[in-house]
Amino acid sequence: MPRYRPLLLGLATLAACEGPQPPAHQRIMDGDPRFGRTVVAASGCTACHHIPGIKQPTGSVGPSLAGFGRRAYIAGRLPNRPAMLTAWLLDPPAIDPATAMPAQGLSETEARDVAAYLYTLR
């Protein structure tokens, strides 16, 4: 082990010099959670969902999105991964024809921003 110590020390030093990493939702998705919050508020998502931080009338047709960033699944059965969430937000019925969630007409950028915002809900 002693002869590997300089190598390990060098690798640890390089890792420390890399600097802070952006949050995972920004690294993976390149979405902006601030814009996503604005899109959520403007798109009427609270008509069906309770969304912490959005002060509008809250519906109960869809699930609460509190803690969404910690969930393992989207819509109860799809893996909660950034690409899947973005695809879901773009056109839920294309992924699950039986879903009650309609397509909201979001652009790809808006969907990434909304996904980034949803991942901040922990």
Q: Can you describe what each PLM-predicted range is?
A:
Residues 1-7:
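Bacterial N-terminal signal peptides that target proteins for export
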Residues 9-11:
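Low-complexity proline/serine/threonine-rich segments in eukaryotic and viral proteins
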Residues 13-16:
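C-terminal motif of bacterial Sec signal peptides marking the signal peptidase cleavage site
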Residues 18-41:
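Electrostatic cytochrome c docking/interface patches
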Residues 20, 51-52:
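Cys/His-rich metal-chelating microdomains
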Residues 23, 54-55:
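Short, non-ligating residues that shape and space the ligands of small metal-coordination modules
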Residues 38, 56-122:
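Extracytoplasmic electron-transfer domains, predominantly the class I c-type cytochrome c fold
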Residues 45-48:
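Short cysteine clusters
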